[in-house]
Every structure is written in C-alpha cells, then in structure tokens.
Amino acid sequence: MAKGQSLQDPFLNALRRERVPVSVYLVNGIKLQGTIESFDQFVVLLRNTVSQMVYKHAISTVVPARNVRVGPGGGYVHSGSDTLQINDDEVE
C-alpha cells in the first residue's frame, strides 16, 4: 500500500460504513454533498438523489458532517477543525 493511502482508505471506509453525510469540495471549487457508497484507488462513488462517480484527482477536501472514528486503534477525525487527530498523533 502506498504511504499516501495509509490514512485515506480507513477514513473513506469509516465514512462509507457509518453512512456519514459528507461535503466533497472539488479542485475547481464545486461542492458536492452526499454519502460515500464506495471507493477504489481512483474514484469515489458519492450518493445523494443520484450516484456520482468522482475522480479522486478532482477532489480537494472531504468534510464529514460529524466526527468519525478511524481504524481499530482509532483516533477521531474532527469535522470543522484544522487539527486531525489519529491514534494520538496530531497533524496540522
């Protein structure tokens, strides 16, 4: 697994599993909202009234509507915060 995906996959999987509503901001500024149905290495399937396949290279930011527990040892991803806390390590 690539080092860049060691946080990405558990984060997206937690959002998918818990059906957390998300706002997805694209690099062109467009905001999409819905829940993550599925994802792979290249795309995220976002569901609202319809399903949209969004290419990851077009995504700037994914903002969950509520806090999400990530991984078995699990810290939380705090929505609306500039600090991401995972497994007691802080990344700003």
Swiss-Prot record:
Q: Which Pfam families match?
A: Hfq
Q: Which InterPro entries match?
A: Hfq, LSM_dom_sf, Sm
Give the Sm domain ranges.
Answer: 9-68
Residues annotated as signal peptide = none
* GO BP, sorted A to Z: regulation of DNA-templated transcription; regulation of RNA stability; regulation of translation, ncRNA-mediated
Question: Which terms in the Gene Ontology molecular function aspect does this entry carry?
Answer: RNA binding
Q: Name any GO cellular component annotation.
A: cytosol
Q: Which Gene3D superfamilies match?
A: 2.30.30.100
Q: Which UniProt keywords apply?
A: RNA-binding, Stress response
Spell out the subunit comment: Homohexamer.
Q: Which family is this sequence assigned to?
A: Belongs to the Hfq family.
PANTHER family, A to Z: RNA-BINDING PROTEIN HFQ
Q: What is the role of this chain?
A: RNA chaperone that binds small regulatory RNA (sRNAs) and mRNAs to facilitate mRNA translational regulation in response to envelope stress, environmental stress and changes in metabolite concentrations. Also binds with high specificity to tRNAs.
Protein name per UniProt = RNA-binding protein Hfq
Q: Which organism is it from?
A: Xylella fastidiosa (strain Temecula1 / ATCC 700964)
